[in-house]
């Protein structure tokens, strides 16, 4: 009640700092930054990853609209990947796509069908379930594709011993 009683309910201040520290500690992350919403968080992460107009970003077919809006805000194009039986991004199909439909050339990942650069992927841990990202993250790291986890629906969920998080 102290936060409400103090009259200091805002996007800044001591309670926001305490919240960020608590989330970082709880998830085992080095840092946590409170954002106004998931769309803003993904938008910022895509900008940091260097996504620009004309680039492509892989996203699941089943998701909240936030990742797709964030991609569109930058003038980039979503490349939709099918969902697995748990409604998450189908990792096997996504890896197959990266290996067979994307050419790695001069440090860029070129979609063979469109000729556009694939810059990032947004796996979404939907309905509290998690995606095993180990192999996908390894492939993306080797190719320089940013992996931006949307863990908005999975706070408190784990992949093995690790919490899901944004900021893979």
Annotate each language-model stretch with its function.
Residues 34, 59, 120-123:
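A short beta-strand submotif of the Rossmann-like class I SAM-dependent methyltransferase core
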Residues 60, 77-86:
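Short beta-strand->loop structural element characteristic of the AMP-binding/adenylate-forming
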